[in-house]
Design a protein with these regions (language model features):
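Generic detection of short hydrophobic beta-strand segments and adjacent strand-loop junctions
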Residues: 26, 144, 178-182, 247, ...
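Catalytic-pocket segment enriched in acidic/His residues
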Residues: 201-268, 272, 280-285
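HotDog/MaoC-like acyl-thioester-processing domains
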Residues: 2-15, 19, 86-177, 253-256, ...
């Protein structure tokens, strides 16, 4: 009698907690910084006019491109059994100073924690982005859950996640609302300009083979577009004021649809403006929930 085939994600090891990804250095030249802004159709001239005083601004969410380029662990054997059960849960981007056009940024990730939750195993990868002189420019916590998995022992952490701001009052009706059209080619545009390629976002054959209804927009694109909406509504169109972007990914965003970004609360604490937002997909479902943007109040 044949043994029954193993099903489900199985047991997840904590042996890789503390280990690093490759380090990847990227030059933020004008071609790339302009292309990233174009990837999300951000029409702010600050990202495109290289004749303006002070030069080009750099969209904060270029951090997602830097993370993507440095995500590899060539000396780590992948868990092929658990991989299909992994889902991206949330991100927390902390910017200590604006990225500068023309600088070289080196990005490296580290698995900083794994813990058992009721839905499965929760993990946090932390990517540090440093300038050529060693200055820490930004950190990105990239968090996921392997649904149904079991940890092989107690929770392990080499670093904690920073607390997120809390909002004293959230009104029932949105304070403001912005609609963002998602064209037929939005995912291809983001793929090539942001340098983030996964065929479920560009090839219907691959997306449907993976059980999706069609190609879907990258979650990082949805967050970047949402940040642009918040910047334009609450920060006078000045993305250089942004110091933090948090959010949880939820529903899928399809092509030829609309993302609706809604501001739910605003507050200023010790000179920092904080905005709570959400993004809805074309079906009215949350695409980004518990979205938070922080930045200099003026």
């Amino acid at each position: 009698m044949l043994e029954s085939e193993e099903v489900g994600p199985g047991v997840i090891t904590t042996d890789d907690v503390g280990r690093f990804t490759i380090a990847s250095t990227t030059l933020l030249d004008s071609r790339f910084t302009m292309a990233y802004a174009a990837s999300i159709s951000d029409a702010n001239p600050a990202f495109f006019d290289d004749l303006r005083p002070g030069g080009l601004d750099v969209h904060p969410c270029i951090s997602f491109s830097l993370q993507w380029a440095s995500r590899f662990r060539p000396d780590h054997k992948p868990n092929l059994r658990a991989a299909p059960f992994g889902v991206h849960a949330s991100t927390d981007l902390r910017i200590y100073r604006p990225f500068r056009a023309g600088e070289a940024i080196t990005t490296q990730g580290q698995m900083v924690q794994k813990c058992q939750l009721r839905p499965g195993v929760y993990n946090v990868d932390r990517y540090r982005m440093t300038a050529s002189d060693g200055e820490l420019v930004a950190e990105l916590d990239y968090n996921g859950i392997t649904r149904g998995a079991t940890l092989d022992g107690p929770d392990v952490a080499v670093a904690d996640e920073p607390a997120q701001p809390e909002f004293a009052q959230v009104t029932g009706e949105p304070l403001w609302r912005t609609e963002i059209p998602i064209g037929l080619h939005a995912a291809q545009q983001y793929t090539e300009c942001a340098r983030i390629y996964n065929p479920i976002h560009t090839e219907p054959s691959v997306a449907k083979a993976a059980g999706l209804p069609d190609i879907i927009l990258h979650g990082s694109a949805t967050k970047a577009m949402s940040l642009t909406a918040v910047v334009n509504q609450c920060f006078d169109g000045d993305a250089s004021r942004i110091t933090r972007l948090c959010g949880q990914l939820r529903g899928m965003v399809l092509m030829e649809s609309v993302i609706t970004v809604e501001g739910l609360a605003e507050q200023v604490v010790d000179g920092e403006k904080r905005v709570l937002f959400r993004a809805l997909n074309g079906q009215g479902q949350p695409a980004v929930s518990n979205g938070i943007v922080c930045g200099r109040a003026s």
